[in-house]
């Protein structure tokens, strides 16, 4: 019986560890920096954001075309048929005359150049597009920051689920050993059946937890693969000497000031407000005239030629003015609508400032409390392990019941999972704090990546 139980225990351990690493048999570990580099290449959502940015950059050249000369080539061929009563030329009544028909064919080709002299609408439109290009740059920076957060969250979620799966596996193995011992003692009449039932219940619960985390691990791996593409490598894991790092600067006021000047959502809202103001000026430009210099050079030929024909080259130059004096009230209504949009953007800017202020304070306090939480979780894990070992020893001496041992053991593994969760929560809170002040870049990923090492053994999970 003991040999069979030991065989089952070893088989369970090996099968679960093999399952955890089934999708990552490669020798070299995939670290956080490499994962983000792959996400930049393989994530279609990020590629769409980059392409949208590139398309937005082209708008400036399109808008500048309204301020530059335009040259057009035109041509036409016309045929004119005319009937004339010759009685009029001879001084006779019309009824005595005869109709004479004639036809004339005209061919013309012309080259026309236009240069805006005063196009207030085009100039204001150009300024609006310049603002939109700046807004597009901030949008891409914000999307990049969110992309970094997505990749980091997906990466560390895989590590979290790997660590939890290993912890629950260890608990399941320990409880399996306890259950084996209890069954043996039950046969000898040394323990009550209720204690065996309690041990079995704890074992079934641990097994359910391990299965649940295995499912969560698969889902986490799929989420990461969705961002970076399929991968076969092990993920680099947190070093055993991982330590809490206090945020720099160390006071909340400094972080709040950084957020007010560098938070990307605030910068986005400010540019959106300027864009709305530019849009209002574009609508107001419709009240002004449009002045253009126009020059034309062409060639005209009429056949058959007559004394009245003007065959040959021709050219002309002049100034053309267009002024829309009334458009059914559309212009005034458009101006008022643009004014409302400016007020809307001002309200959105105020909301962005308030939200950034709240977010940075919340993120800073989370990182600050993570220090106390990590220390407390670590102390609880160490002390609960000591209590668990002591309970097992006291059980052997008859001072504790098996229920006491199982409770202490459950508390020890619960403290371990709490500590694991606290570590990964801290890492994500650090990234969120940096994002709240617009400073989450590849540099910050590299600093965090320094705490990762290649997968070494199941205990490293």
Predicted regions and their residues:
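Amphipathic alpha-helical coiled-coil segments
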Residues: 48-63, 143, 147-168, 177, ...
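Periplasmic alpha-helical coiled-coil/stalk elements that build and connect Gram-negative outer-membrane
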Residues: 146-260, 366, 370, 411-413, ...
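Acidic, low-complexity, intrinsically disordered peripheral segments
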Residues: 418-461
């Amino acid at each position: 019986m003991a040999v069979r139980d030991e065989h089952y225990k070893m088989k369970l351990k090996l099968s679960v560890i093999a399952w955890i690493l089934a999708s990552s048999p490669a020798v070299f570990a995939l670290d956080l920096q490499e994962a983000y580099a792959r996400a930049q290449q393989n994530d279609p959502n990020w590629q769409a954001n980059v392409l949208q940015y590139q398309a937005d950059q082209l708008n400036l050249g399109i808008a500048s075309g309204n301020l530059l000369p335009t040259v057009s080539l035109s041509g036409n061929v016309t045929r004119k048929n005319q009937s004339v009563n010759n009685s009029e030329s001879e001084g006779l009544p019309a009824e005595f005359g005869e109709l004479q028909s004639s036809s004339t064919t005209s061919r013309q080709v012309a080259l026309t150049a236009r240069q805006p002299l005063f196009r207030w609408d085009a100039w204001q439109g150009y300024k609006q597009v310049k603002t939109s290009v700046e807004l597009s740059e901030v949008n891409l920076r914000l999307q990049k920051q969110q992309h970094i957060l997505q990749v980091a969250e997906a990466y560390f979620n895989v590590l979290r689920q790997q660590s939890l799966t290993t912890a629950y596996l260890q608990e399941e193995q320990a409880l399996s050993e306890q259950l084996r011992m209890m069954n043996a003692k039950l046969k000898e009449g040394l323990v009550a059946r209720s204690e065996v039932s309690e041990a079995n219940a704890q074992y079934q619960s641990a097994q359910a937890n391990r299965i649940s985390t295995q499912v969560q691990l698969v889902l986490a791996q799929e989420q990461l693969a969705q961002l970076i593409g399929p991968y076969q490598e092990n993920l680099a894991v947190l070093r055993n000497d991982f330590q809490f790092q206090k945020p720099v600067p160390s006071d909340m006021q400094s972080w709040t000031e950084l957020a007010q000047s560098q938070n990307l959502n605030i910068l986005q809202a400010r540019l959106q407000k300027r864009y709305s103001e530019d849009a209002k000026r574009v609508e107001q430009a419709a009240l002004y005239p449009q002045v253009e210099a126009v020059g034309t050079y062409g060639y005209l030929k009429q056949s058959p030629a007559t004394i009245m024909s003007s065959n040959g080259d021709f050219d002309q130059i002049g100034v053309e003015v267009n002024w829309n004096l009334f458009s059914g009230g559309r212009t005034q209504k458009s101006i008022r609508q643009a004014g409302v949009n400016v007020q809307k953007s001002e309200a959105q800017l105020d909301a962005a400032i308030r939200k950034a202020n709240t977010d940075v304070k919340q993120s800073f306090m989370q990182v600050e409390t993570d220090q106390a939480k990590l220390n407390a979780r670590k102390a609880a894990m160490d002390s609960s392990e000591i209590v668990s070992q002591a309970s097992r020893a006291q059980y052997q001496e008859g001072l504790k019941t098996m229920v006491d041992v199982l409770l202490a053991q459950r508390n020890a593994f619960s403290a371990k999972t709490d500590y694991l969760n606290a570590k990964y929560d801290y890492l994500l809170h650090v990234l969120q704090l940096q994002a709240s002040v617009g400073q989450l870049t590849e540099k910050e990923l590299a600093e965090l990546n320094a705490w990762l090492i290649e997968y070494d053994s199941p205990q490293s999970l």
